[in-house]
From Swiss-Prot:
Gene3D superfamilies found in the cross-reference section: 2.30.30.30
MF-aspect GO terms: rRNA binding; structural constituent of ribosome
Protein name: Large ribosomal subunit protein uL24
Claim: Ribonucleoprotein is one of the keywords in the record: yes
Amino acid sequence: MKVHVRKNDTVVVISGKDKGKTGEVLRVIPKTGKVVVKGVNLVKKHQKPNRQNMQGGIIEMEAAINSSKVMLFCEKCKKATRISHKLLENGAKVRVCKKCGETF
């Protein structure tokens, strides 16, 4: 499944319980079409004590959300935006903001 965002992109959640939150993409899972966004879709995991974490307990971590629920955030126009692809003279393919024309 094709995903329109990449790791380290800043995105805005456009639907669901975390609607309106902004965060950085930590991980992209193209096989399922999901992304993990920092500070979004937090779930509690019950961690057993092990060698790395002797204490154990309940930890909060980010869970994956569908990539269709996020939009790329443009730093120039400060809005969530769609993207288009543009071919440069040197043959490089870049992502461009549909609202202001800024390249990502």
